[in-house]
Amino acid sequence: MQFSGKTVIITGAGKGIGRACARLMAERGAKVVALSRTQSDLDSLAAEIGARGIRVDLADPAATRAAMVQAGTADYLINSAGINVLESVLDMTEAGYEAVLGINLRAALICCQEFARARVAAGGGGAIVNITSIAGHRGFQDHLCYAASKAGLEGATRVLAKELGPHGIRVNAVAPTITLTELAAEAWSDPAKSQPMMVRHPLNRFAEAEEVAQSIALLLSDDSRMVSGAVLPVDGGFLAV
């Protein structure tokens, strides 16, 4: 799976799965356009892999759209940006809801729309991978807004695949289990919480960011040219049991 001569836009590229994707795609020859709200992350990516960085707060819809226009026409889009606000159902706040849905769902849809507009104008083709979560399939304590955002993005992935397919644009999603990133540490750092969750995985471990990135690269590649509208669990068998 080589991507020489191709360009990929990656949201949330500064950390976690997004950064792992940036490194892997660059290693395989792609030019990386990295979107992040943290300038230091963009600077380090530029030094490490030569990524072109665009600083943007994806909580701002207008800024998100402007950043995608600035990014220009690309061959691939990876929607990796995501946040979580841990609140119980009874304690959920509008601020938490707006923050999580704004970045995890609304920003992803804006990015898909602008990417698709540019691809259609260029004659079609290309591929998108949205990063969702097993939280969209199973109920986890304090993950109400996060689960809603990820389940919503999976539904959107299927609609995007249907509407963009005639233009030769494939759209898929990956649904990782808990992945060893800073975001996951906020929710799963307590062994009393994480250990019972880990043993529910047939492989008896959580995912590494690089493992999720490899699955994303597979879906973007021509090896998956007949795959669209799919959600690939990267979960060590969690959803199977």
Spans of features found by a protein language model:
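Residue(s) in the substrate-gating loop at a strand-loop-helix junction
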Residues: S133
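Short C-terminal tail/terminal secondary-structure segment
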Residues: R138, A217, S228-V241
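Substrate-binding pocket helix/loop in short-chain dehydrogenase/reductase
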Residues: S88-V89, T93-L101, M197
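Conserved glycine-rich cofactor-binding loop
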Residues: T7, G14-K15
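Active-site helix of classical SDR
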Residues: C112, S149, T157
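Active-site loop immediately N-terminal to the catalytic Tyr-X3-Lys motif
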Residues: L90, R138-L144, P166, N204, ...
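Short, small/polar-rich loop/turn modules that mediate ligand/substrate recognition or access, typified
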Residues: G165, R170, V227-G229
